[in-house]
């Protein structure tokens, strides 16, 4: 592989040039089979053929597919990757949803996008009956394409057309559909190609051969993982899929991985392995890419001093993951999220909010022009909601969030307003706020002292209706009204 990676012109170029011409014999994707022992390898040649099968299948199933939304509702699997390319190259709009959300959340998102088809893995994540009742005729298995002959590909994707929808948590209690185009993707690929070149020229350990392999435990419906699906074909790298954290060490042992995209919680686990002398169970893993929440700089420095490379990233779904990268292993910059890349404009406004402008910025929020106008100003600057400072060397340091979205160490985003609305349904609660405390979701509740047990029971019931990562794990009671500002708004600090 050449040190200079040629960024593809689009999704069509990614398949026809990168997969079929440049790296047909490279391993594209690995995963552990259902027996828990066998490693399945799919080369780029096979991958491209399956993408062609998916394109042919979708065009037959949805003859007027141009612009139609096709939903993926599945755990991490090879077929998810095939479908992602296939939907786009068939002319559809790719929609990735979190299969572990409650039915209330999924019902809202599905109702908003009005899917033509839903490709799903058939697993009951808690709302299978509701899904079948509402969308039964539109459900298809993830491997629906397997008996279809490979079809012809055409470059049918307009560079500025709506290419995909990915939902992101919002502070209003409702998720928002982020509209992304091929132009957004290609802008992001410029950054990730430079990341790959940086690894090649500066980071490759002695004796390590190319191409590299990347382990991912993050869900494919999340942008931090999805960018790997789109950014590795130009480099001919392999993506090792792990779908369950309980299988992490098993899969890592079976599939050698050089690099891993990780939530902070898993970086801490690897750090503990290092401290306990259990590095061998990592099977040669040496580079960790981390985003979503801050990491202890002392921990990062110690990892670096013991042969690991930890790259911190700052990006958003709204920018196709493009953003700020930190490659330094220097102690004074360990707490920085890094420096902005050269392909995008960045600034800190008068409040210290990070603003981004460039081809990576989304088209807007789906069917929500008001929310779009709130974050993209008349000059095209996207206001991220994150506050930061910049040092004399150009490194950015996140100092807080302009809004109240809670980012847990697991990388999950939680809207406090959503939980507060649920708690407000309890007659015994006078007022409440939900906040993060010691990496836990904590509810501070003002209620009569003799109603506290009733409130605890209500919180338990609310938790039963929520995904694990959203559950309230700490409750603090106060017999005094919660503090408010001069405008009467509750103070969260």
Spans of features found by a protein language model:
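Conserved pre-ATP/AMP-binding loop-to-beta segment of ANL
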Residues: 24-27, 150-167, 173-174, 203-213
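AMP-binding/adenylate-forming catalytic core of the ANL superfamily
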Residues: 358, 363-364, 387-470
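Conserved AMP-binding/adenylation subdomain of ANL enzymes
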Residues: 186-213, 220-284
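Gly/Ser/Thr-rich phosphate-binding loop
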Residues: 252, 258-262, 270-332, 345
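Conserved ATP/PPi-binding loop(s) of AMP-dependent carboxylate-activating enzymes
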Residues: 339-342, 349-375, 395, 412-414
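N-lobe entry segment of adenylate-forming
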Residues: 1-61, 66, 85, 111
